[in-house]
Amino acid sequence: YQVLSSPRDWPSSAQQRCGWRSCPWSVENGGVPRSVFVHETIDIVGQGQYAYMEHVRGEPTNRMPGMTTLQGSFFVLGFGGGRWPQVVNIWDCGADGWEGWRRNLDRLNLKRRSAFYGDWWDEASRWRTGGYDRVCAGVPGSPTTEEIAERGIRGSLFVNEVFTVRPGTQVEFLAEVVDCRVPVFADHGVVATGLWE
């Protein structure tokens, strides 16, 4: 889940849900840095989604300390609703939150790109024509990539929902998702792997 806006405050009642960590997000209020993710929607050439996802798993910085980590790479089902062929990649910018995002963004400039990637991007262009990125911040109740791994969360079908809400209501909306939808999903064996705005 993601809501695209920046919150002013997170209700204290929403800081502890569903057995996940309580984490006030505001660094200014003495909290820890927020987890930051990049949600990429990639336009795929023909039926190249499988080859592209395999290529993404070999992204050079994926195993470097302090760089992004691929949380998951998913293809959009043509029969499942939505635009296709596409692949959705979720990149975790690390424990440093916004600073981790800044550091990873810096490595993409033209002078540094060759040092990190070599021919990786040129090869990736065989399977993709472009895409759209969203920079998202995790909210209380959203597991980190490490927590997902520790809990052994895996699946063959992931539902990716993007909502647009009235400006200024994204925090309230996500608190309701944590309060109301997450428990209902859990009753049916469905686990939220990302709650981002």
Show which residues each predicted segment covers:
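An amphipathic, aromatic/His-enriched active-site/gating alpha helix that lines ligand/cofactor pockets
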Residues: 1-24, 31, 50-74, 79-84, ...
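Short, solvent-exposed polar/charged micro-motifs at secondary-structure junctions
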Residues: 82-85, 143-145
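Surface-exposed interaction/gating patches
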Residues: 23-24, 31-51, 139-197
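Residue-level detector of short, conserved catalytic/binding motifs and their immediate flanks
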Residues: 38, 85-87, 131, 159
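Short amphipathic alpha-helical patches
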Residues: 75-76, 87, 148, 196
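Extracellular/lumenal glycan-associated surfaces
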Residues: 41-42, 91-93
